[in-house]
Amino acid sequence: MSARTSPAEAFEKIATLIFVDAPAAAAARAAEVRELILARRAEGKAAVLGLATGSTPVPFYRELIRLHREEGLSFNDVITFNLDEYYGLSRDHRESYFRFMQEQLFAHIDLKPENIHLPDGLVPLDGVFKHCADYEASISAVGGIDLQILGIGRTGHIGFNEPGSSRDSLTRLLPLDIVTRQDAASDFFGEANVPRFAITMGVGTILRARKLVMMAWGGNKAEIVARAIEGPETEAVSASFLQSHPDARCFLDRAASAALTRTRLPWLVGRAEWTPAETRRAVLWLALTEKKPVLKLRDGEYNEHGMAELLTRYGKAYHLNIEVFNRQQHTITGWPGGKPNADDTSRPERAAPFPKTVLVLAPEPQDDVLGMGGTVERLVNQGHDVHVCYLTGGDLRITDAEAIRFARVLLETAEQEPARWKEQIDFASGILNDIEIKGPFGDPPARLRRLKALIRRGEARDAALSLGVKASQIRFLDLPFYTGGRYRQFHLGPADITAVGSVLATLRPHQIYLTGHLADPSSVQGLGFAAFKAAWEARDGQPWQEHCRVWLYRGHQSEYEPHEIQMAVPLSPDQLAHKLAAVRKFQSHTLPDLLDGNRNRQTARTYDALGTAEYEAIEAFRRWQS
């Protein structure tokens, strides 16, 4: 087990470093790799690195490339072994891990081809066992792996060691978990195209590396990260086996660390600062833990949970309970744009000016409706000037089957009057031909991507219109990082920032709503937020910015914890039903578990458990300040 260095890490069974963001963590990790390479070179030996794929290591690989290009770090004597490969994919397949590594790292540094090792996704089935044994032997032949880089999947897997993998497992062929395949669906233009099997290093293979580093970014990884670091070692979470390794560490950004005890319940691992925010977090946690409304908490319950110091400040639980309850109660408002001519002292949003110009930014179509569809409708109905701006077209989420359906409808319609509709016939026929030529896994031609974007654009427009937004106030920016890229191959550039900045400068809004602040920085949502942040900071100090409030919502991600919420907008049963009807406008791609409204209902149930008024559902927001 890796050593812990402070009381704050008392619950952690793997040494964990928390960084402000993913680039900072990646830079620290890359600097250590540099030292390893130089140290092994000084010994006359080659550094042996175990590498991972997916979006998590992308910032790390970009930093290694920078070290090579700008600081002269050579990789010409480094040996690499990758964790895994999809079974059935050729090395030149657009989603093969061999191609991923070439595009993300190998093609940009001076690593020798003969020193690169990945499992072969096309080895015949009757040769898989020998191929896996040979892979193990190749690792042993170079003296083992000095440093193994790992990510962690939503099921807690490292490599493709899905739940149930043994601690002693070796390199092998195995079936992929349904959650893993769903997560990869957008990469393969639909879950049906995701390979069902992969060849992966085993947990035992991974644990033989001399050093292990697991990296995780974004709030969606927080819960599984905490289970791996603080929970028991279990085959249900293969990453938990790192706990028994003598030199394993985790590198996290703040969002990925959110469920760790030292982040979530800091008073249990050391002296708390007891700021107003931390006090609120502690009292709400205690109420939910004791399954009591806030106003019913007693002195003894504070003492039993290590929170006696709070009582020394407030005297009795009675006074503390009232203060925290009032703060939580005041987050609730049916007027997200501010209630005109009302005392706004205790309201989350100011009354004036009224009406407000409101800008809703959605990194991908549907983010806005999922995260705040009910709030959008309230803002419109209460007289505000609401603009919705989609940063990307969302075409990468659309399957070929949807494009075929639309192309066939267009073709059959145009064929009714072929003389007048020749261009439409040519376009539809071209789409169908493009899909046939590229097959299920090829890169989509620009024409096909345009059609898919139009499909998604139509759904987004229908959804926004159903919530009352004017057609003239629905914008599609089609940011270049998305139109010219693909998942895990996005690069934010000046043109993206300029486009977002132009919208801000044109509208000069009083309110902005957006998401992506807790997302993986390589994701569309993370990059969308980064584009906004850069555009905002480029205009820092403009008079309109001083009067603009930025509210953060959650899109596809899990909802805020109650202590994080600064504005809670309640929805009636009818309002929730109307929101869900808008969500269902997105017929080409919608995750089934987002169609029932349970996320918003659960937030309302949590507020109810804390003792506030009972609502059908609640949409939650936090304020962002630059």
What residue spans do the PLM features occupy?
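N-terminal glycine-/serine-/threonine-rich phosphate-binding loop
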Residues: 1-48, 66, 343-348, 352
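Conserved phosphate- and dinucleotide-binding cores of soluble alpha/beta proteins
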Residues: 2-3, 20-25, 38, 87-95, ...
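Short internal beta-strands
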Residues: 77-84, 249-254, 387-391
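Short Gly/Thr/Asp-enriched flexible loops that form oxyanion-binding sites at enzyme active sites
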Residues: 60-66, 158-171, 519-537
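Structural motif
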Residues: 48, 79, 146-147, 211, ...
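Glycine-rich phosphate-binding loop signature in dinucleotide/nucleotide-binding domains
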Residues: 40-45, 140-144, 503-510, 515
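Active-site beta-strand->loop->alpha-helix modules in alpha/beta enzyme cores, enriched
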Residues: 290-365, 369-544, 580-584, 600-610
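A conserved mid-domain beta-alpha-beta active-site/ligand-binding segment of alpha/beta enzyme cores
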Residues: 558-608
